[in-house]
Amino acid sequence: MTAAHADLQAEFLEMPEGLRIDRPDVADGSALWRIAKDSKTLDLNSSYSYLLWCRDFAGTTAVARAADGTPVGFITAYVRPERPHTLLVWQVAVDAAYRGRGLAARMLDGLTARVTDEYGVTGIETTISPGNTASERLFTSYAQRHGADLEREVLFEAGLFPDAPHDPEVLYRIGPLSH
C-alpha cells in the first residue's frame, strides 16, 4: 500500500459525526436489503442475495456505519472474473437520513483505495439507468477527482429485460486508476 493510499483510507474509514466505513458482516445483510428497498431507485435483490454479498464479496464491498455500528449505506461490488483488474460496482445506496453528506462518494473513494491495493484493480465499471442523476453525478465526479477517463455505452438494451418496462443500462467505464 502506498503512503497516499494509506492516507486516503484513513481519511475515509473515519468520518465526521461518528460515521465510519468498513467491510460488511453477514449480520449486515438484512440492513443492506432494507436500505436498498427504501431507496426506491435500485432494483431490489432477494434478501438472500444481500446475505451472500456480505459473506462472499465482503472484500469488495463497503458498509458505512453510524456511531452505534448500524449500517447506513453500502456499496456492493465484485472483481470481474474475465477482467481481474476491473471492479464492477453493483449497487450504491445511502439511508435517507444520511443523504446529502457526500457519504456515497466517500464510500466509493475508500472502497476503490482498498481494492486497488488488495486486488490490483485499475478500473471500475458500473451500470446506470438513464435519469438516475445521483449515480451519474457520483461516478462522473469520481472520474474527475481521480483524473481517470470515463467512457459510456449502452450495455443492456431495454428489450433484454424480461420484466418490462425496464430502462436500458448504460455502462460507465472509469480508468485507469493509479495505484
Swiss-Prot record:
Task: Name the EC number(s).
Answer: 2.3.1.178
Tell me which InterPro entries the record gives: Acyl_CoA_acyltransferase, Ectoine_EctA, GNAT_dom
Biological-process GO terms, alphabetical: ectoine biosynthetic process
Q: Does the keyword Transmembrane apply?
A: no
Coiled-coil segments on the chain, per record? none
Q: Enumerate the GO terms in the molecular function aspect.
A: diaminobutyrate acetyltransferase activity
Q: Where is the N-acetyltransferase domain?
A: 19-174
Q: Which UniProt keywords apply?
A: Acyltransferase, Transferase
Q: What class of enzyme is it?
A: transferase
**Which pathway does the database say it acts in?**
Amine and polyamine biosynthesis; ectoine biosynthesis; L-ectoine from L-aspartate 4-semialdehyde: step 2/3
Pfam family name, one: Acetyltransf_1
Give the family per the record. Belongs to the acetyltransferase family. EctA subfamily.
What NCBIfam families does the record tag this protein with? ectoine_EctA
**Name of the featured protein:** L-2,4-diaminobutyric acid acetyltransferase
Q: Which organism is it from?
A: Streptomyces avermitilis (strain ATCC 31267 / DSM 46492 / JCM 5070 / NBRC 14893 / NCIMB 12804 / NRRL 8165 / MA-4680)
